[in-house]
From Swiss-Prot:
Any one Gene Ontology molecular-function term assigned to this protein's record: 5S rRNA binding
Known function: This is one of the proteins that binds to the 5S RNA in the ribosome where it forms part of the central protuberance.
Cited NCBIfam families: bL25_bact_ctc, PRK05618.1-2, PRK05943.1
A GO-annotated cellular component: cytosolic large ribosomal subunit
Subunit-structure text: Part of the 50S ribosomal subunit; part of the 5S rRNA/L5/L18/L25 subcomplex. Contacts the 5S rRNA. Binds to the 5S rRNA independently of L5 and L18.
A Pfam match: Ribosomal_TL5_C
Full protein name: Large ribosomal subunit protein bL25
InterPro entries associated with the record: Rbsml_bL25/Gln-tRNA_synth_N (IPR020056), Ribosomal_bL25/Gln-tRNA_synth (IPR011035), Ribosomal_bL25_b-dom (IPR020057), Ribosomal_bL25_C (IPR037121), Ribosomal_bL25_long (IPR001021), Ribosomal_bL25_short (IPR020055), Ribosomal_L25_dom (IPR029751), Ribosomal_uL5_bac-type (IPR020930)
Amino acid sequence: MSEVLDLSAEARERAGKGASRAIRREGRVPAVIYGEKQEPASIHVEEKVLMKLLHTGHFFNSVVMLDVGGKKVRTLPKDVQFHPVTDRPLHVDFLRIGEHTKVNVNVPVHFKDEELSPGLKRGGVLNVVIHDLGLSVDAAEIPEEIVISLKGLEVGESIHLSQVALPKGASAQDHEDITIATIVAPSALKSAEGEEAAEAGEEAAEG
């Protein structure tokens, strides 16, 4: 299960661009808490602490417990706006949730048992189609990752959504049996990349 992240916050008295710029100059990031049929709450958080949480790699599929003036608020991060040049966070949206609220999250997909794949042993290449899997899951049971075994996979074989073991109580947001990954021959991969490059060249020539 993904760990619960803690983040201190302070209520934001003033709104507007001028107030937000002033907050950022103090090393803080404006944010808002919304949802659960309650009024949105304007807050701000420390930029350095927020950056540490963003660098965990699982910020968006973790419950974040906000401490707003001593009051604990259970939330799920929904969006972070970044500066286009400096890449510093400009604003954060937090969705207020209950302990067992059903939430939609994108969970990273990881693979194991590469050494047990005959296709990879013969020089095949793992072509990952889906890097994050959209799940609908209990907020208290959000997985940190979905691990998929490559055991027994030959060149030309694929892993589909229907073959992936999801955590108990979780369901995929995508109802189609999408392809997660495929073992391809190196020549097939190079051919596909060559075709894409050729198409890009043709489009550039036409444009």
